[in-house]
Amino acid sequence: MTTVDQYLSAADHAMQQGQPPLALQLLMAALAAFPEHPDILSRLAIDAYRRGAMREAIAYFERALAVDESPGNRCNLAMALCDVDRYASALQTIQALSERQCEDPLIQFTAARAWRGTGNPERALRAISRAIDAAPEDADFRLLRAQISVDQDHWDSALTDIAAVPVLRLSPFQHYRLCGLLMQTGQFTRAMPEYRALVARAPAYAEAWLGLAAACERANDLDGMQDALTRVQVLPLNSAQHAGVNQMQGKLASRRNDNTSACRFLGAAYEADVSDPLWKSQVGFDYGQCLDKVGRYAEAWQVFNTAHATRNRIKTDAAGDHQALDFFALLRVPVSGHWPALAAPADHRPDPVFVVGFPRSGTTLLEQILDARDGLVSFDEQPYLPKTLLALQNDGIVYPSELAALDAQKREQLRNYYFKQTEALVPDRDGRRLVDKNPLNWARVPLIRALFPQAKIILALRHPCDVILSCYMQNLRSTVLG
């Protein structure tokens, strides 16, 4: 009689010989002979997982766990459940084990995925940090913690983890995730060479070409965007990838003021059968804007309504700094009408120019005008001042009522923290004055006055009806509203 080990060994040999169908046939024969053996069930689950048959894989993992509640079987099942977005089931499977085996990095990694998927970023961050403590060189662990940080707008923490990822040892998929994180943190010019390195080693990776096109568009390299789209269109594409190409083609046409073509491309993307609601909503906003530009107002309004409804159905549980940075909480706090005159700081760094206003009121245009002038340098909209406010509050200082009590040392410490953040995008100012464009910083004017007494504040004004309509036409996604 053939033993379990003999079946598994024969299946291994078939895989090594490049015969996956034979390997599966041997595993099925083994299952017929030993229907409840956990090793056979696990191997069948892994085989199904590799084939992308996730429902089949989960069924085998569940059967394996039913006969052998080993940590490995429990972790494998939870990981597969995460892969199909069944995060609540994954958490139920892994939570107790993760609390017992805090030092096992893979278990903590799996638990972190489940916690993140169920909307508990704090627990996710604790779990993934334990995994990294045990295995600091693991790229997947670093990338997940960076993603959790990005989810919460903790960009500085995310960039720290990204910098620790060994890029040269990444798989193409890991490299693609790293590129995506750079895009999410506004590092477009850093993302472009990473995408180019990725497509050089994996030229058939369609999503990487699309990512490169998106990075080029954000960096205003329209020729690079066109080249990436030309390259990706010669590849065999599935329906979702075709939709992605249409989206990028539409954005390129729009940037070139060919709104008729943009509507055609974006309309095709919008009508595509793609299940990702986040992507679908973004395409809706892009399409609606093009419809508006060509005068198809009723259609545009309908598309915007659908895009908002799709966006609102997405579960958003981002917490992070939300309580401390919440814009509306700032508005509820009374501000003293007394504005004491403060002496210029002794560090001789010129105080920034702050461009504020309501979103869609023209702040970006003002920023671009200022950035074009000698002696000024701007950076992409960043939460540097909100983060500085958070640092102040974390020190137990009540904002804004206790600002007047700040001593010179604390002011200097907070100024240093603000300027240190700006170095991520402006490492060498060469004496130039920073232009900080973050529209809703007008709610933080008391902090600006306290830390940057020589700062200039420019308020952009636009008719409120235009502002509200323009905001409705945008996919405004900030978790902390500036």
Task: Please provide the spans of the model-predicted regions.
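PAPS-dependent sulfotransferase catalytic domain
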Residues: 152, 185, 199, 205-207, ...
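PAPS-dependent sulfotransferase catalytic core
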Residues: 282, 298, 302-414
